[in-house]
């Protein structure tokens, strides 16, 4: 495990955001809060093995491996506990987030609208060992996001691009000071993502940068403490 999470130079901007910031519901459809939690060393081995074995087999709008590692590192560095994911797909990014949450004492709330992808994700959560750290919803995020009370200190959005801006508008008041709102496909998402990025970069409550990662890009917007 010692070599898995080296910090490449590409992470420097994200680290800078955290340095700058230091200066300044609806019940889940699926949850296993009572499941026995694996010891950290055992869980690390189980998740790492699962992610490595499945590294080249993810389909259906899952993030690339490199971007999953970025999510993991952001949650660990920020010590985030109240995590929301919009767009589970079959669970690759969720597993990275939940693995990090297992170390920060947190939990991931994730939303998926497609039943087949949702069902596959649940099985992947069990196989990887992170199911106890996930509340998974089979729901339309357009409606559910508005209903969730928060607060959240980390949000990852990887869903319908034409709704990126609305998701942020709905969630911005529910993000804790010092928390981060991240969105995938920041470099390849088309006009809808450009509109979202223009809006969030102009929001004085947040400081935003783009992490290239796999090349698809991830926007990282951290809320400035008042």
Q: Which residues fall in each region the model found?
A:
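A short alpha-helical cap/connector motif
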Residues: 4-5, 13-156, 161-226
């Amino acid at each position: 495990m010692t070599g898995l999470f080296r910090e490449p130079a590409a992470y420097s901007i994200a680290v800078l955001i955290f340095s700058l910031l230091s200066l300044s519901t609806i019940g889940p459809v699926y949850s296993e809060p009572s499941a026995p939690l694996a010891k950290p060393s055992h869980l690390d081995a189980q998740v790492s093995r699962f992610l490595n074995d499945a590294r080249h087999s993810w389909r259906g709008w899952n993030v690339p491996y490199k971007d999953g590692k970025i999510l993991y590192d952001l949650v660990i560095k920020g010590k985030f506990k109240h995590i929301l994911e919009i767009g589970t797909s079959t669970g690759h990014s969720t597993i990275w987030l939940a693995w990090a949450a297992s170390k920060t004492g947190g939990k991931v709330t994730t939303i998926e609208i497609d039943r087949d992808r949702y069902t596959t994700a649940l099985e992947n959560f069990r196989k990887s060992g992170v199911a106890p750290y996930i509340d998974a919803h089979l729901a339309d995020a357009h409606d559910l996001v508005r209903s969730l009370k928060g607060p959240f200190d980390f949000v990852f959005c990887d869903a319908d691009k034409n709704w990126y801006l609305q998701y942020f508008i709905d969630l911005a008041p529910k993000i804790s000071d010092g928390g981060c709102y991240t969105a995938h496909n920041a470099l390849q998402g088309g006009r809808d993502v450009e509109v979202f990025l223009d809006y969030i970069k102009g929001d004085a409550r947040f400081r935003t940068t783009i992490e290239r990662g796999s090349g698809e890009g991830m926007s990282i917007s951290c809320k400035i403490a008042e």
